[in-house]
A protein has these predicted regions:
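Amphipathic, alpha-helical segments enriched in basic
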Residues: 12, 32-35, 39, 273-282
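Internal low-complexity, small-residue/proline-rich segments
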Residues: 43-331
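Intrinsically disordered, low-complexity segments enriched in polar/charged residues with Gly/Pro
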Residues: 8-11, 23, 28, 281-286
């Protein structure tokens, strides 16, 4: 018997394994599945944040209704209105006890905002900038369907009336368009500045680069002479071009400014526009958010609806007025 008879025979059959093509296919499929899972998780988180934002507006609406049942009028617009309903929102007394006490705004002696820490319910978690400052807030009352200016009084055809004026109080009986068809409050993105968070953040120098990257967080100026309401569309076209520069948004950041308000002059998530002419002293300041396709809007009956960016302009205008007599079908 030869020596070779005792040596094991080697199999000529190829061993099973992955080819490079198969490996690449597996990696590609894994990457696609991972991206789908991440997208689903992110979408789910944003849906949860949008629902939380809707819940905040609903609680604000309920607090306003309770405030009305106590005082017989709606709270004044701006920060002070939010301060007055804060005990009804989170149970903390704040600086003024509104339970059973007359509204200082109604008596013509409205205090300044002062050093006030905002309740968490006034923050929308979809906007990461709410964590930057102590006094920034996400929500604002409706100033109606017309221009308004900081410090002006009694200029709103909505439920908010600009600055404090004891002769311009509004009650539910003044909302003849119906509580279910009249917007009460919505949301706005907080503006950005180039300095660290502080009480005087709004005094920081304007940062054009930040504004260009975040156009919905600022009020954009116009350079042309627009002095009549019918010129508003021309003014907006100039503002949308971004050529005129911008200023920090007074109604979002900081929250210690008197008039956190928005109006229905432009559709949701449009640029805010500030005219240059003195006869148009207030901006066109629509609600803005990071929610996909629209914003949450709270109504005077306590309900909250999601309004898409492409809403019919006439319907949007009608939702802003309290006594315009328009129909708001189509929302």
């Amino acid at each position: 018997m030869s020596r070779n008879d005792y040596e094991p025979r080697r199999s000529t059959r190829a061993r099973p394994g992955f080819t490079i093509v198969e490996l690449m296919v597996v990696i590609a499929v894994t990457a696609v599945l991972a991206s789908l899972i991440v997208a689903a998780v992110m979408s789910g988180r944003e849906s949860a944040r949008r629902m939380e934002c809707s819940s905040h507006l609903r609680q604000i609406g309920i607090a306003v209704q309770e405030y009305h049942s106590i005082h017989g009028v709606l709270p004044c617009s701006g920060l002070l209105g939010f301060r007055y309903i804060s005990p009804l929102v989170d149970g903390r007394p704040g600086n003024w006890n509104v339970y059973g006490a007359p509204d200082p705004c109604m008596l013509g002696s409205c205090p300044e905002a002062g050093d006030w820490m905002r309740p968490r319910i006034y923050l929308c978690s979809s906007d990461p900038e709410v964590r930057r400052t102590r006094r920034s807030g996400s929500y604002c009352f409706s100033a109606g369907n017309q221009l308004f200016g900081v410090g002006q009084r009694g200029v709103s055809d909505g439920v908010g009336f600009g600055d404090v004026d004891p002769t311009k109080v509004i009650s539910f009986r003044n909302i003849t368009d119906g509580l279910t068809s009249t917007a009460l409050a919505s949301e706005q993105l907080i503006s950005l500045t180039s300095v660290a968070a502080s009480d005087v953040e709004y005094l920081a120098a304007f940062d054009q680069a930040l504004a260009d990257q975040n156009p919905l967080r600022y009020i954009w100026n116009s350079t042309g002479t627009f002095s009549l309401p019918q010129d508003m569309q021309a003014m907006c076209a100039e503002c949308d071009s971004g050529a005129a520069g911008a200023v920090p948004h007074f109604s979002g950041n900081p929250f210690n400014v008197r008039v956190p308000s928005y109006n229905h002059t432009r559709p949701p998530n449009s640029r805010a526009c500030m005219p240059s002419a003195a006869t148009m002293t207030g901006p066109m300041s629509p609600p803005t958010s990071l929610h996909r396709f629209g914003v949450n809007v709270g109504f005077c009956d306590g309900s909250v609806r999601f309004v898409v960016n492409g809403i019919d302009v006439k319907v949007w205008h009608s939702l802003g007025t309290r006594n315009g007599g328009e129909t708001s079908s189509g929302l």
